[in-house]
């Protein structure tokens, strides 16, 4: 059975198995009976339409491995953003069972910070069974803000005045891949230079002790015949 393309993408960008692992805690995995996640992308701008309905496979068994992945959490802790080194971001969220039964759809709002103002990104509507979403092709060195708000089912008239669910937000900045490679290369070069300096210091100490101050034999006290 062939693995889904998304899992292959995440596996390809993962570092070696010896790296530190941030395991997925209980409650972040999608339900076993949720094989698909329906979603709709609503583009911004004057030519934006209603968007078409799409389906994607949920991510299961994901592990955020450093240094190829950085995890950021919202203030409430129910939304997490895994910033991958291939300029994509995997969002994961969880709800209590009682809250999940009242959700009709999730609204994901995106914006990024400019010099003087914020600019909106595409808005995504996700089905109630969705617990993750992959945001591809984020720009380097741009401060993003993602907010996820659960929209409830239609309620009775006496409950309609209840306040809506607050959105969970998380902010992140994708570090340029080239900058990561430069940092790794500079770290390796710096380590090599330190090793060379230690070797040079040991050689200087050896030369100073053995060559500059040689050990002379003491003259014998015996008379020669």
From Swiss-Prot:
Residues 72-167 form the Fibronectin type-III domain. It is a single-pass type I membrane protein. Residues 20-181 are extracellular. Its main location: membrane. Keywords: Glycoprotein, Membrane, Signal, Transmembrane, Transmembrane helix. InterPro entries: Fndc10. Residues 1-19 form the signal peptide. The chain crosses the membrane at residues 182-202. It comes from the Eukaryota. It is found in: Membrane. GO terms for cellular component: membrane. The keyword Membrane applies. Glycans are attached at residues 86, 109. PANTHER family: FIBRONECTIN TYPE III DOMAIN-CONTAINING PROTEIN 10. This is Fibronectin type III domain-containing protein 10. It comes from Rattus norvegicus. The gene is Fndc10.
């Amino acid at each position: 059975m062939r693995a889904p393309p998304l899992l292959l993408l995440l596996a390809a960008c993962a570092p070696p198995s010896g790296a530190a692992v941030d395991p997925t805690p209980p409650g972040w995995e999608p339900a076993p009976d949720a094989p698909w996640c329906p979603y709709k992308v609503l583009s911004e701008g004057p030519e934006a339409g209603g968007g078409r309905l799409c389906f994607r496979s949920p991510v299961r068994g994901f592990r955020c491995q450093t240094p190829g992945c950085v995890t950021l959490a919202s203030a409430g802790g129910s939304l997490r953003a895994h910033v991958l080194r291939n300029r994509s971001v995997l969002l994961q969220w969880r709800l209590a069972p009682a809250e999940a039964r009242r959700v009709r759809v999730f609204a994901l709002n995106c914006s990024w910070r400019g010099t003087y103002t914020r600019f909106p990104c595409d808005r995504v509507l996700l089905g109630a069974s969705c617990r993750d979403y992959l945001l591809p092709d984020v720009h380097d060195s741009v401060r993003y803000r993602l907010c996820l708000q659960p929209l409830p089912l239609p309620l009775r008239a006496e409950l309609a005045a209840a306040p809506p669910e607050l959105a969970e937000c998380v902010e992140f900045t994708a570090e340029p891949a080239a900058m990561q490679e430069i940092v790794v290369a500079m770290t390796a070069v710096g380590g090599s230079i330190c090793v060379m300096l230690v070797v040079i210091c040991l050689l200087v100490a050896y030369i100073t002790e053995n060559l500059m101050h040689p050990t002379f034999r003491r003259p014998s006290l015996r008379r020669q015949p």
